[in-house]
Amino acid sequence: MNYLKQLKQSGEFEYSLAANAEEIKHIEEELGILLPEVYVNFLSECGSCNYGDVYINGIYKEKDTISYPVVELTKQLREDLHLSEDFIVLHYEVDEFLTLYKVSNKIRLKDAKVFEAEVFCNDKGEFKIDKPTPMFDSFEEYFEDFLSLGED
């Protein structure tokens, strides 16, 4: 799939510069996982993207700056909400819901399911994550749905 070409077809989408192999390796090392091939291709084409306040997190890169929102959010939610190490965070609507992508620390998957999980406050005032439920069978399906935001 040509992610960047599809994003460019609508002026409404924003995206960052493509990630290189070293930057992608940095994500994997920081999170202790192997990213699925399809997501590596996405990062290699456009790093990350958004439509308004809806993001597909990855690597945010401009001329002289680089940040790793997928690493920062995933680490934060692993610590704060005990997110399983089998997921990375593609999108986080603060204190509402997560969009998660299944990963492995042993094998590089070709693609994987995308899940959603509600974030809620329990009786003790602590934020927790509901059990993730499948939302899309693949990253490509998720991306196609993301592109539909530009059609409204």
Language model features: what each stretch is:
Residues 1-99, 149-152:
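A surface-exposed partner-binding patch
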Residues 63-66, 70, 128, 132-136:
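Intrinsic-disorder-associated interaction segments
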Residues 92-119:
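Amphipathic protein-protein interaction modules
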